[in-house]
Amino acid sequence: KQHGLQASIFLERIENEDSENDLAHKNLIWQKQLEDAYYHQQIERLEDLKIEIGKYKNQSQNIFNLYALVVFSIASLKKQIDQISENIKRQVRQIVFDSDEWSESTLQIFAMTMMIYAPEDMDFLINSIFRTYRHNVSNLSGQLQEIMSAIAINYLANVYVQRRKIDLNLIYDFISKLPEIPRNAFAKIVANYYHYCFDGKNEEVDQIIEFMKSNGMSHLIKNFIVENCHL
C-alpha cells in the first residue's frame, strides 16, 4: 500500500507537470499570436484569443496577465478603454503595485495598461521603472528594450494628451542610450517626434509624420502616436 500510494503520488505529480508544461507552451504561442495580431490590428483574431485564453485565465498568474493584455489590446484598438470592467482594471493595478521587482511580465502589463492610472501614480511608477533600468541600457535583453521603449512612448503620449509640463529627461535619456539598431528605430523616431511636439517645433513634427507615411508606417501613426500635435 505504501508503494502504491507513493506511485499514485508520483503519477499525479507527473500529470501535473505535463499539464503545467503544456500550459506554458500554449502561453508562448499565445504571446506570439497576440503580438502579431496587435501589430497588424487584427481585432477579430484578438477576440478569438480572448475567448481561448479566457478558458485558462484562472490557472496561473502568467495566463491571467496574458488575458489582461489581450483585453486591453482590443480596447485600445477599438478606442474603448472605458468599457473594460472595473474588476479587470483593479486586478491589473494590484499586479503592478504589488510587484516586488520590475519583471518583464509586470512591465508588459504596465506598458499596455498605462491609461488606467492617475497621473501621479503613473509618474511614480515611471520614475521607479526608469531609475531601475537606466544603467547599462545597451546590455538589456532585446525583449526588455522593446517593452521599455513601449512604456516610454506611451508615457510621452499620455503626458502630451494631458498637456502636463513635467521633466521628461529620464525618458529621453533612456531612449538615447538604446543601441542604434533597426529594432529600436521606431522608438527613437517617435521619442524625437514628441520632443518636437513639446518644444513646438511644428516643421520637424511634420517632417517625421511625412517620413513615416512615405515609408509604409501609416498604421503605426494611427494607433501609436498623437498626430497633428501643433502647439
What is the predicted function of each stretch?
Residues 24-31, 43, 47, 86, ...:
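Amphipathic alpha-helical repeat elements characteristic of tetratricopeptide repeat
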Residues 1-9:
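DNA major-groove recognition helix of helix-turn-helix/homeodomain DNA-binding modules
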Residues 37, 53-57, 178, 212:
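Eukaryotic all-alpha helical interaction scaffolds
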Residues 48-157:
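Mid-protein regulatory/catalytic core that forms ligand/cofactor-binding pockets
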Residues 12-41:
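Short, charged recognition helix plus adjacent turn
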Residues 43-47, 83, 120, 166, ...:
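Residue register within tetratricopeptide repeats
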Residues 34-41, 45, 77, 81, ...:
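Hydrophobic/aromatic side-chain positions at a characteristic register within alpha-helices
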